């Protein structure tokens, strides 16, 4: 069962001080939120001096609250001409404010300061109150906030990051002892960089003890506004106890990469790498980008929901929310593409299916700006069509034109991308620290220290992978001409889907035919799609022309055996097999990897949901940045997971 998030209660004392009724404590010192942020946390960590000249600098905070420490740090970064190239701020919050309450709190706190603009941007970008990591970018991606919504005791051990500074800012230890526990400090030590610093307003004995036990050295400093003392210090363990060191940037002489495959996965990678200053050669075997499954007229876009909030649910939720944020950023930058904005409804296929939806909805407790449960009457009213059962309404779900999205992402990369269409890679070769993409004629197409395979089923061949289970699945969609269907106000899915296009055409589909590689449109596929949509939405489809006159399209999804994509660094399978005995109990982090070789493929029918998140994950891995997902979700998409299972079961091929 997921841990439901309980929002914070907005409350003020008579003197205007913001308080937490849940914890019986104030949010900031009487001297003011920004005075505390600047004196205790920014100066206490010797900032901005410590981030100057760095490529990336990462701050981890234990309690986000109203975000004033983040806003003050952002302002300090903005005012520093020698600032780091990219500032990451990771913060944990068990009880996030709603967007409206955050906006009200910040309008009160920033009054009379120069931070109104940043406060507005933060509130505008505030995510829905659902568990997990939420990544928000500001300053064109140079200031990155990762909000970890949930209990820090559970989420901190799942953080993959190298922290340069810590802001220890929960409510007082006497009010919220859990956030100052030994487990929390051990989790902080696990992600601490060698020269990491910390600062906290508290000088309580339990805090000092927990710091020392976790390997931190502290010293007292005068507190703010008459407070006797605060603590600052460094990570200075007496001995090394970490099995795995925090991540570092891939050591490359030049920030150049080759991305093979210009569909949703590849184009998202181009945009994310270019945003970090990488120059990318994008290689596509077809004459234009988005020519295979990404060339469909539209694709539906929504998260899964299950009562137990399993891996697929958490991954699709993270991917859904991350993609929305990235798409809005693209649109804000002027790179527009067609997508529906009227929401999407997921209809139950049976009474039992509706019960499962209701149980999942109740378990998550998500707010209405993320999902709403509709009974059959409400679903009928929403669609203005007869339906047998209710479903889930996702107000930000819908349909997207994939090729337009791909074009927008390539355009956003600007001069940092070199596009090579009509070019097929026959093999990859590595010479020292350089990868070469070689054509059928033996000529080098491109070279770079990093290659990312985003070319669906062909990735397995190019990488020589033997322990990846991929299957082609044929999908045929049908286009019903204008005037043959009733109006549909938004995309609807269930056993099949229906998407109204701007020209009045209705897209329905799609067949699911494993191991069928026939590219030709078949009448049987049209009939199957029609039967499915007539069952899902009786009354939507009227008389249609002869089936053999209908237009459609065939594309192939590449599906992984466990229905989870393959995203991340590729394993060195030969070395792993040679050391199979030693690796029989290995975790993902223990496996040898092929230097500079990554993959983003096996997205099945969820390319729109997973492509942006997968690109952000790989870009973060390359740069040694905090990862946008919890550790077990990173492991869940690791391309080496099938190799790990083979090693454990001693079933190496």
Swiss-Prot record:
Q: Which UniProt keywords apply?
A: Cytoplasm, FAD, Flavoprotein, Methyltransferase, Multifunctional enzyme, Oxidoreductase, S-adenosyl-L-methionine, Transferase, tRNA processing
Kindly state which reaction or reactions the protein catalyses: 5-aminomethyl-2-thiouridine(34) in tRNA + S-adenosyl-L-methionine = 5-methylaminomethyl-2-thiouridine(34) in tRNA + S-adenosyl-L-homocysteine + H(+)
Q: Where is this region: tRNA (mnm(5)s(2)U34)-methyltransferase?
A: 1-236
Cofactor(s) named in the record: FAD
Pfam families, sorted = DAO, Methyltransf_30
Annotated InterPro entries = FAD-dep_OxRdtase, FAD/NAD-bd_sf, MnmC-like_methylTransf, SAM-dependent_MTases_sf, tRNA_MAMT_biosynth_bifunc_MnmC, tRNA_MNMC2, tRNA_S-uridine_synth_MnmC_C
- What EC number is given for this enzyme? 2.1.1.61, 1.5.-.-
Gene Ontology, cellular component aspect = cytoplasm
Tell me a GO biological process for this protein: tRNA wobble base modification
Primary site of residence: cytoplasm
Q: Where is this region: FAD-dependent cmnm(5)s(2)U34 oxidoreductase?
A: 260-653
Q: Which GO terms describe its molecular function?
A: flavin adenine dinucleotide binding; oxidoreductase activity, acting on the CH-NH group of donors; tRNA (5-methylaminomethyl-2-thiouridylate)(34)-methyltransferase activity
Per the record's keyword annotation, is Repeat included, yes or no? Answer: no
Highest taxon, organism lineage: Bacteria
In which compartments does the protein localize?
Answer: Cytoplasm
* Assigned protein family: In the N-terminal section; belongs to the methyltransferase superfamily. tRNA (mnm(5)s(2)U34)-methyltransferase family. In the C-terminal section; belongs to the DAO family.
Question: Main role?
Answer: Catalyzes the last two steps in the biosynthesis of 5-methylaminomethyl-2-thiouridine (mnm(5)s(2)U) at the wobble position (U34) in tRNA. Catalyzes the FAD-dependent demodification of cmnm(5)s(2)U34 to nm(5)s(2)U34, followed by the transfer of a methyl group from S-adenosyl-L-methionine to nm(5)s(2)U34, to form mnm(5)s(2)U34.
What is the designated name of this protein? tRNA 5-methylaminomethyl-2-thiouridine biosynthesis bifunctional protein MnmC
Q: Which organism is it from?
A: Burkholderia vietnamiensis (strain G4 / LMG 22486) (Burkholderia cepacia (strain R1808))
């Amino acid at each position: 069962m997921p841990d439901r998030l309980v929002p914070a209660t907005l409350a003020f004392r008579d003197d205007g001080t913001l308080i937490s009724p849940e914890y019986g404590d104030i949010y900031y010192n009487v001297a003011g939120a920004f005075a505390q942020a600047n004196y205790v946390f920014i100066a206490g960590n010797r900032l901005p001096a410590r981030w100057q000249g760095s490529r990336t600098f990462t701050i981890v905070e234990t309690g986000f609250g109203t975000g004033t420490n983040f806003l003050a740090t952002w302002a300090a970064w903005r005012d520093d001409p020698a600032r780091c190239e990219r500032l990451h701020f990771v913060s944990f919050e068990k009880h996030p404010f709603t967007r409206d309450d955050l906006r009200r709190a910040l309008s009160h706190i920033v009054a009379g300061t120069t931070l109104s603009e940043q406060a507005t941007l933060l509130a505008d970008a505030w995510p829905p109150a659902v568990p997990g990591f939420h990544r928000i970018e500001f300053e064109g991606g140079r200031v990155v906030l990762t909000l970890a919504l949930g209990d820090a005791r559970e989420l901190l051990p799942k953080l993959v990051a190298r922290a340069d500074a810590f802001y220890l800012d929960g409510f007082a230890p006497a009010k919220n002892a859990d956030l100052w526990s030994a487990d929390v400090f051990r989790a902080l030590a696990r992600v601490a960089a060698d020269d990491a610093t910390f600062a906290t307003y508290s000088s309580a004995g339990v805090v000092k003890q927990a710091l020392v036990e976790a390997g931190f050295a502290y010293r007292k400093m005068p507190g703010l506004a008459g407070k006797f003392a605060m603590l600052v210090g460094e990570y200075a363990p007496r001995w090394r106890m970490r099995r795995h060191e925090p991540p570092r940037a891939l050591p490359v002489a030049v920030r150049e990469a080759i991305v093979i495959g210009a569909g949703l996965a590849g184009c998202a990678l181009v945009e994310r790498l270019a945003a970090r200053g990488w120059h990318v050669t994008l290689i596509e075997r077809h004459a234009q980008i988005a020519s295979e499954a990404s060339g469909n007229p539209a694709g539906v876009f929504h998260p899964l929901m299950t009562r137990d909030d399993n891996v697929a649910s958490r991954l699709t939720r993270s991917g859904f929310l991350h993609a929305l944020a990235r798409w809005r950023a693209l649109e804000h930058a002027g790179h527009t593409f067609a997508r529906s904005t009227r929401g999407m409804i997921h209809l139950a296929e049976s009474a039992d299916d509706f019960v499962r939806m209701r149980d999942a909805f109740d378990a998550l407790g998500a707010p209405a700006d993320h999902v709403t449960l509709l009974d059959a009457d409400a679903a009928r009213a929403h669609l203005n069509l007869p339906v047998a059962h209710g479903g889930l309404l996702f107000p930000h779900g819908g349909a997207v034109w994939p090729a337009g999205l791909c074009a927008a992402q390539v355009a956003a990369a600007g001069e940092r991308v070199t596009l090579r269409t009509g070019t097929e890679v026959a093999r990859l070769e590595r010479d020292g620290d350089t990868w070469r993409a070689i054509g059928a004629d033996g000529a080098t197409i491109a070279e770079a220290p990093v290659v990312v395979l985003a070319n669906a089923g062909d990735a397995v061949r190019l990488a020589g992978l033997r322990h990846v289970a991929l299957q082609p699945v044929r999908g045929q969609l049908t286009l019903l001409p204008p005037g043959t269907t009733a109006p549909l106000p938004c995309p609807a899915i269930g056993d099949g889907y229906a998407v109204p296009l701007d020209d009045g055409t209705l897209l329905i589909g799609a067949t699911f035919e494993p191991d069928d590689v026939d590219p030709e449109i078949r009448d049987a596929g049209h009939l199957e799609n029609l039967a499915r949509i007539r069952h899902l939405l009786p009354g939507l489809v009227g008389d249609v022309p002869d089936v053999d006159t209908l237009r459609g399209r065939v594309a192939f999804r590449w599906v992984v055996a466990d229905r989870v994509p393959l995203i991340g660094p590729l394993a060195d399978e030969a070395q792993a097999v040679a050391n199979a005995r030693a690796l029989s109990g290995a975790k993902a982090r223990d496996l040898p990897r092929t230097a500079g070789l990554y993959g983003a493929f096996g997205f099945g029918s969820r390319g729109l949901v997973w492509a942006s998140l997968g690109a952000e994950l790989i870009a973060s891995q390359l740069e040694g940045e905090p990862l946008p997902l919890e550790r077990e979700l990173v492991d869940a998409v690791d391309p080496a997971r099938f190799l790990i299972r083979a090693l454990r079961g001693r079933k190496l091929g």
